[in-house]
UniProtKB/Swiss-Prot annotation:
A Pfam family this chain is assigned to: tRNA-synt_2
UniProt source species: Actinobacillus pleuropneumoniae serotype 3 (strain JL03)
GO cellular component terms, semicolon-separated: cytoplasm
Assembly mode: Homodimer.
Family: Belongs to the class-II aminoacyl-tRNA synthetase family.
GO terms of biological process kind: asparaginyl-tRNA aminoacylation
PANTHER family in alphabetical order: ASPARAGINE--TRNA LIGASE, MITOCHONDRIAL-RELATED, ASPARTYL/LYSYL-TRNA SYNTHETASE
Designated name of the protein: Asparagine--tRNA ligase
EC number: 6.1.1.22
């Protein structure tokens, strides 16, 4: 074992009792007893709980330094690991030396003083909020989920592909994209028609931050069979809500020779795999969320893992909603995009389990989704989860060039702009499928937090790009 084990390694029993170690971290609290002892709670972020260090007043720097330690000071505490008589911890550290690495400049104005802070306040000090129990737990759970996603796809034979963040394509056809330009805004070059001349821009054409890696992912799926992307995406959607971010991470698998049914099975297997991983690997953090954020969060994930996914056609889902007798805020009729209240009714009240809604009207879905034989619906799916609603959206992709071209024209897109995407249908086309999972929305579901801005280190939203 290293001379500098983590707090996690010590508390989990990987360090033998009696071993001399040095622990590097930050002070969470200091408590002094009348018996001439000080109790330092030292954390290093490796796990939820701090390590209690017992410091005797015979240390040379006890009066000058130890008694001045406050929350946030960085220290290296050397000592012996011993069994702890205190409840709730198996071991503690009996210190023989305390080195103060960094002081907190003014403890009275330290933004992360040892007291309970509101979530809203923590957003204002996002550079310091990972020092709190809450955001530290979120960060570890986020890491665990990301690692589990990579493990799952690797075990399933998928290859990770890096897709570009700068693109000239609008995957969703929604137009809510951030433009990337190096043109001088004070003297923009103009065409004869008076429009901005993007041919003089850095890329020689109008360019944007990507809203999805899907189209690029499809090109590799049509060569490597199974691929996935996992990276940041951007939406210039002016939505200042608890569910939206302008910059967020997406998980997007694409696989060849796959139907919509294969797609739904992959989504179910992936979600259950990552939920199982977080419950097993981050027990302490999940117990914190269950105690302080959402008492049902662990039970909800356990039930999710144990439940077979229900499946329902969009048309049947509309019938269920119409016959429910419930008054929804948004009226129900065939052709609408299901709102969150409709999704949650289906998952929580009707099916009482995760549910895959499939075969949506073509007019509310993207151009690349495979047109069904009825000519009115596409082979699209949404996975709805109890407690949140939609968590995954996907489809079988349109592999027929003539149908794809017709859909593009119907939606006001120029097929020539997507010449490279159309090439996939010219040269050995295959049925293929994929889906998108908003990573932050997944973390919201796992932690029980109500606002998506708590689960990404530095949230980007309308009029908010601090830090």
């Amino acid at each position: 074992m290293s001379k500098f084990p983590t707090v996690s390694e010590i508390l989990s029993g990987k360090v033998a009792v009696g071993e001399e170690v040095a622990v590097r971290g930050w002070v969470r609290t200091r408590r002094d007893s009348k018996a001439g002892l000080s109790f330092l709670a030292v954390y290093d972020g490796s796990c939820f709980d701090p390590l209690q260090s017992i410091i005797n007043n015979d240390l040379a720097n006890y009066n000058d330094e130890v008694l001045r330690l406050t929350a946030g000071c960085s220290v290296i505490v050397t000592g012996k690991v011993v069994e702890s008589p205190a409840e709730g911890q198996a071991v503690e550290l009996h210190a023989t030396h305390v080195e103060v690495v960094g002081w907190v400049e003014d403890p009275d104005t330290y933004p992360m003083a040892a007291k309970r802070h509101s979530i809203e306040y923590l957003r204002e000090v996002a550079h310091l909020r990972p020092r709190t129990n809450l955001i530290g737990a979120v960060a570890r759970v986020r890491h665990c989920l990301a690692q589990a996603i990579h493990r799952f796809f690797n075990e399933q034979g998928f290859y990770w592909v890096a897709t570009p963040l700068i693109t000239a394509s609008d995957t969703e056809g929604a137009g809510e994209m951030f433009r990337v330009s190096t043109l001088d805004l004070e003297s923009l070059p103009r065409t004869d028609e008076g429009k901005v001349d993007f041919s003089q821009d850095f890329f020689g054409k109008e360019s944007f931050l990507t809203v999805s890696g899907q189209l690029n992912g499809e090109t590799y799926a049509c060569a490597l069979s199974k691929v996935y992307t996992f990276g940041p995406t951007f939406r210039a959607e002016n939505s200042n809500t608890t569910r939206h971010l302008a910059e967020f991470w997406m998980v997007e698998p694409e696989f060849a020779f796959a139907t919509l049914a294969d797609n739904a099975k992959l989504a179910e297997d992936m979600l259950k795999y990552v939920f199982k991983a977080v419950l097993e690997e981050r027990k302490d953090d999940m117990q914190f969320f269950a105690k302080h954020i959402d008492k049902d969060v662990i039970t909800r994930l356990e039930n999710f893992i144990a439940s077979p996914f229900a499946q329902v056609d969009y048309t049947d889902a509309i019938e269920i909603l119409l016959k429910s007798g419930k008054e929804f805020e948004f009226p129900v009729s065939w052709g609408i995009d299901l709102s969150s209240e409709h999704e949650r009714f289906l998952a929580e009240e009707y099916f009482k389990s995760p549910v895959v809604v499939k075969n949506y009207p073509k007019d509310i879905k993207a151009f690349y989704m495979r047109l069904n034989d009825d000519g009115k619906t596409v082979a699209a799916m949404d996975v709805l989860a109890p407690g949140i609603g939609e968590i995954i959206g996907g489809s079988q992709r349109e592999e027929r060039l003539d149908v794809l071209d017709t859909r593009m024209v119907e939606m006001g897109l120029n097929p020539e702009d997507y010449w490279w995407y159309r090439d996939l249908r010219k040269y050995g086309t295959v049925p293929h499928s994929g889906f998108g999972l908003g990573f932050e929305r997944l973390i919201v579901y796992v932690t029980g937090l109500q606002n998506i801005r708590e689960v990404i280190p530095f949230p980007r939203a309308p009029r908010n790009a601090n830090f």
